[in-house]
Design a protein with these regions (language model features):
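Short, Lys/Arg-enriched N-terminal segments with co-localized hydrophobic residues
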Residues: 1-7
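Conserved donor nucleotide-binding strand/loop of the catalytic core
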Residues: 50-54, 65-99, 137
């Protein structure tokens, strides 16, 4: 386990982006997230924040790694990690968390199902409410086939019944965490 406490950078948000075959989506995501950070730099409560993007290529076969490398050429705030094969989203997220140096760390999908526009609101909730983490959940399944929505709801209900955990329907990996929370996850 890589411990980054000594290297933590105050007022920095690290964005961990696990990617598997996201060659087409990654440039769109990058444009959107940089737009959000540019907007945040104009607002008084977030003006001093900087960011780093940590793109974790989970063994993609479509050129995702080439796109990630290209992004690092023009933006020193972008880093990438490359896996030799597909180890799964959780392994990619964990590797990204291990390399994140920000005082705050977010996990976001590159396919824009996690709206980057929510990041300022999530940051505000983290700061004003004193939370260690702010998570998201999907409230609507518009555009998804009815049969998939049906089985997703059934899955969450069943898992809540057979486990001691309350499984929230539509819970997402998209979250913003403070350093204390991230370090606890990694320990």
């Amino acid at each position: 386990i890589i411990c980054r406490v000594a290297g933590m950078e105050k007022n920095k948000i690290s964005i961990v982006v696990p990617c598997f075959n996201e060659k087409e989506a990654l440039p769109l995501f990058y444009n959107k997230i940089t737009q959000v950070f540019n907007q945040m730099s104009q607002e008084s409560e977030t003006a001093g924040l900087s960011y780093e993007l940590i793109i974790v290529d989970d063994g993609s076969m479509d050129g995702t790694l080439d796109v990630a490398k290209e992004l690092t050429v023009n933006d020193s705030g972008v880093k990438y990690i490359s896996f030799s094969r597909n180890f799964g989203k959780e392994a990619a997220m964990y590797a990204g968390l291990q390399h994140a140096v920000g005082e705050y760390v977010a996990i976001m999908d590159a396919d824009l199902q996690d709206p980057p526009d929510m990041l300022p609101e999530m940051y505000k909730a983290l700061m004003e409410e004193g939370y260690d983490a702010v998570g998201t959940r999907r409230v609507t399944r518009k555009g998804e086939p009815a049969i998939r929505s049906f089985f997703a709801r059934k899955f969450y209900r069943l898992m809540s019944r057979i486990s001691k955990a309350n499984m929230v329907d539509g819970a997402r990996d998209y979250r913003l965490m403070n350093r204390k929370y991230v370090d606890a996850l990694l320990s």
